[in-house]
A protein has these predicted regions:
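Jelly-roll (double-stranded beta-helix
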Residues: 1-151
Length: 151
């Protein structure tokens, strides 16, 4: 993914990396494919709890090992201006994850196929959780998922 912005940055973000951008006081930007190889990327927007700040752009490469059969907290390396966390995992085996039942959660299947709390999900599906104390993932084939932990 190629990132270009009005502050003069031109960056090629490698496959599997996570990019964080906070537009703050304002920035114009574009994201696009920098090669002839087809690519796919997700763009997620979370409303900040701080405004009129300096624009920030950074990225981090998370490895497969960082995410294999566990949730990796993306927001530890790339903090966001909100009471929220983004977690990412690649699952090849069944997995249970404890939740705080006072928070809200949303899980999105980036790729693969799995059952989450007895709901069958495939690539592109999502499921929300309120007042739950755990997520039980049963893999049907290798699955990559993003878990949103929200206020």
């Amino acid at each position: 993914c190629r990132h270009t912005d009005s502050h003069g940055k031109v960056l090629d973000i490698p496959a599997g990396a996570v990019q964080r951008m906070s537009t703050g006081r304002g920035i114009k930007h574009t994201e696009g494919n920098a090669s002839d190889t087809p690519n796919r990327y997700l763009q997620l927007w979370i409303k900040p709890n701080m405004f009129d700040t300096e624009p920030i752009h950074e990225w981090h490469q998370f490895t497969r090992e960082d995410k294999l059969n566990k949730f990796c907290d993306i927001t530890e390396k790339l903090p966001i201006k909100q009471d929220a966390k983004l977690l990412s995992g690649i699952f090849t085996e069944d997995f249970t994850f404890e939740l705080n039942n006072t928070r809200r959660y949303y899980i999105y299947v980036v790729s693969g196929e799995a059952s989450v709390n007895n709901h069958s999900l495939i690539e592109g599906d999502g499921l929300s959780f309120i007042n739950e104390d755990k997520i039980e993932i049963t893999t049907k084939k290798e699955s990559e998922m993003i878990l949103f932990d929200l206020q």
